[in-house]
Each structure stands twice: as structure tokens, then as C-alpha cells.
Amino acid sequence: MKKTKFFLLGLAALAMTACNKDNEAEPVTEGNATISVVLKTSNPNRAFGEDESKVAKLTVMVYNGEQQEAIKSAENATKVEDIKCSAGQRTLVVMANTGEMKLAGKTLAEVKALTTELTAENQEAAGLIMTAEPVEVTLVAGNNYYGYDGSQGGNQISQDTPLEIKRVHARMAFTEIKVQMSPSYVNKYNFAPENIYALVAKKESNLFGASLANSDDAYLTGSLTNFNGAYSPANYTHVDWLGRDYTEPSNNAPQGFYVLESTYAQNAGLRPTILCVKGKLTKHDGTPLSSEEMTAAFNAGWIVADNNPTTYYPVLVNFNSNNYTYDNGYTPKNKIERNHKYDIKLTITGPGTNNPENPITESAHLNVQCTVAEWVLVGQNATW
């Protein structure tokens, strides 16, 4: 019996020693804490609907160094409250509309390295993914509040300045397409639009960073045709959801697509983002071109074949060209930026091109006017 008691006492002593060693190895915290985070989101764009700004799922992660200390989500909310964590220096990472993305247990470096791809679901505008850059905070024991008005008491962080999350996507759209042939063509040609395409669109972008554009050279197109032009990507996939039948665009019914951030760098295989309208070149009265007229138009590079009057009017979005003008003194950047709207007014002044993925000549028969804003609107005017 005594041997048994001594044996149990020995086990208890060993257990206490082990516990003490474990406690010594753990980081010392100032006490238990909670953090509540409230968001500031961009105003919705009425033309595309409330879905552009909808936060279907909001996720907040708390990091102690590289390690995830807490993660909590809320459905259909712009705040996540009472996230249980520990006091001390911490990093907050906030994301919205992450869908089935697995975030639990990821290190801070792993989260910062996350990417996303352009999908058909993005084009419905519902639940566009949003992120905020990681922010460092000092949490105290008790209740902490980020972005609140101060009435809650506790430790107020960034009082009255909620954390702002921004859409990862941008939107490019025609808000007007009009045919206004120049004197040289007004009595010869007209144009009958049939389709609108995102002709060249980046497939992937980062989710965090000063720029979300990455060096991945994969692109998507809504067109079935391979053009092999100077702007044609080497890595190119057709998806039918980046093309649609023509509907006359307006400010209240823009016609376009959601796209990802991208940068143009020809030598690196990175291409401009192109929005394009496709249709038929016709006689000035809308009747079909004659065989002779089609042959002449084909030889001029305006239509795709001497028996096919299909023509294209491409617009390189947020691009510098003498054919493009921008509203409000905006300077084009030759790239797509997250959380921007690129609203494009296209004026067609003559025949189009049979290769919309080649550079546009300064004498092209198009004018582009673009308005840029964050959820910023960029107004671009294009004249062909």
C-alpha cells in the first residue's frame, strides 16, 4: 500500500514539474481579452445593384506574430464582436465573402500569400471578395473595440474610423456605344453590334499587398476566336461567361464585366485588359455589304474575311491613347486597379478591325471617354 502511495506521489510530482516547464515555455500575456471590429464599406453602385457591396460573410483573424490566435466569422454583418483572444501586440486580418476558402489555422504569411481567380460567380456581383491590409493593434485585458464610436467603453482603437475593406475586383463596362460615322464614311458604312466581350482579362490576382497584380501570365477571354495579335496572351483560356449578347448600354444599365487587378508589361508576358464590342460592318443604310465592298473592307483590315463582314472595336481599359479621353483630369495608368469602376463611352466613327488584339493605330475609327472612380469611377471616352 505504501509503495502504491509513493508511486502516485511520484507521478504527481513529475506531472507538476512538467506543467511548470510548459508554463515557462509559453509566452506571457497580459490577460484575457476580446476584440470587436466594425467595418466601413464603399457605397453600392445603383446601376449594378446592392450586391456589389453585400457582405455575405465577414471574417476576422487575430495573429500573435505568425500564429493565428483567433478566428471568427459573422453572416450578413459589417461587424464581428467578442472575438476571444489575449492581450498584447496583435495583428488583425479582415476579409469578406471568402466563400469556401479555408482560413482556420493559416499563418499570417500564408494568409498574405493567398490568391483568387476570376470566376463565373464573380460576374453575378453577389459576394465580391473584399480584403483590408493587416493592421497592428495593442489589445488590453478586457474588451477592445476597433472602429467604434466610443460609447461602448473599454479600450477604443481607431475610434470613429472603422476598418475599411475594399473589393478585390474592378468593374469595366460600356455605358454608351454610339455610331457617329465621320464625313469620310457616313454615306458608306454603318455598324450593327452583336456581342460584348472581355477580350483579355487576368485570371488571377493576389488578395493582399499594395498592388494585387502578380506575375502569373494566365488570362481569360470571352471570345471563341484566336487572334494571335501583339496583345494576345501566351496562356489563354476561353470562358463563355466573359461574353454576352449585345444590349444597348446606359448609365443605369452598364454592359460589362468584373475583372481582377493587372499590370501591362509586354516583355514580361503581361497584357492590357481589353473590353470589346463585336458586330457586322454594313452599308450606311444597314443593308449587307456587296461582295466588292467586303473584299475592299477585308483588304483594308476592317473585317475578318472577304465574305464575312464581322468587325471588332476593342477598348484597352485605363490605357493611354490619343483616341482616349478621361474625365476629371484623370491620368490613365495602363493597368487595372482593384475597387475601381471603368465606365466607357464608345463613339464609332468608321470601320473597325479584324484583329482586336493588335495595337490600335492613332488613326483608328474610335473615340473613348472613360470615367474612373473608387468604387472609384473611371470615365473613359473612346472614338473609333
Curated annotation (Swiss-Prot):
Keyword Lipid metabolism: no
PROSITE patterns membership: PROKAR_LIPOPROTEIN
Predominant location: other
GO MF assignments: structural molecule activity
Any one annotated GO CC term: cell outer membrane
Lipid-binding residues (covalent, S-diacylglycerol cysteine): C19
Covalent lipid adducts (N-palmitoyl cysteine), residues: C19
Signal peptide: 1-18
Region (Important for oligomerization and fimbrium assembly): 375-384
Propeptide: 19-46
Domain of life: Bacteria
Subcellular localization: Fimbrium; Cell outer membrane
Keywords for the protein's UniProt record, in alphabetical order: Cell adhesion, Cell outer membrane, Fimbrium, Lipoprotein, Membrane, Palmitate, Signal, Virulence
Processing and modification events after translation: Synthesized as palmitoylated lipoprotein precursor. Efficient export to the outer membrane and integration into fimbriae requires lipidation and subsequent proteolytic removal of the lipidated propeptide.
Site positions per UniProt: Cleavage: R46, A47
GO biological process, one term: cell adhesion
Additional observations: The name (major fimbrium subunit) does not indicate the abundance of the protein, but is derived from the greater length of the major fimbriae. In strain ATCC 33277 and strain 381, major fimbriae are 300 - 1600 nM in length and about 5 nm in diameter. In contrast, minor fimbriae are only about 80 - 120 nm long. This length difference is observed only in a small number of strains, including strain ATCC 33277 and strain 381, and is due to a loss of function mutation in FimB, a protein that restricts fimbrial length in other strains.
Subunit field text: Fimbriae are composed of a major, structural subunit (FimA) and the minor components FimC, FimD and FimE. Head-to-tail oligomerization of FimA molecules mediates assembly of the fimbrium stalk, while the minor components probably form the fimbrium tip. Linear, head-to-tail oligomerization of FimA is mediated by a conformation change, facilitating the insertion of a C-terminal beta-strand into a groove in the N-terminal domain of the following subunit.
Family statement drawn from the similarity comment of this UniProt entry: Belongs to the bacteroidetes fimbrillin superfamily. FimA/Mfa1 family.
Protein purpose: Structural subunit of the major fimbriae. These long, filamentous pili are attached to the cell surface; they mediate biofilm formation, adhesion onto host cells and onto other bacteria that are part of the oral microbiome. They play an important role in the invasion of periodontal tissues. Fimbriae and their constituents are major virulence factors. FimA proteins from different strains have highly divergent sequences, and this has been used for classification. The sequence-based classification correlates with pathogenicity.
Protein name: Major fimbrium subunit FimA type-2
Originating organism: Porphyromonas gingivalis
Gene: fimA
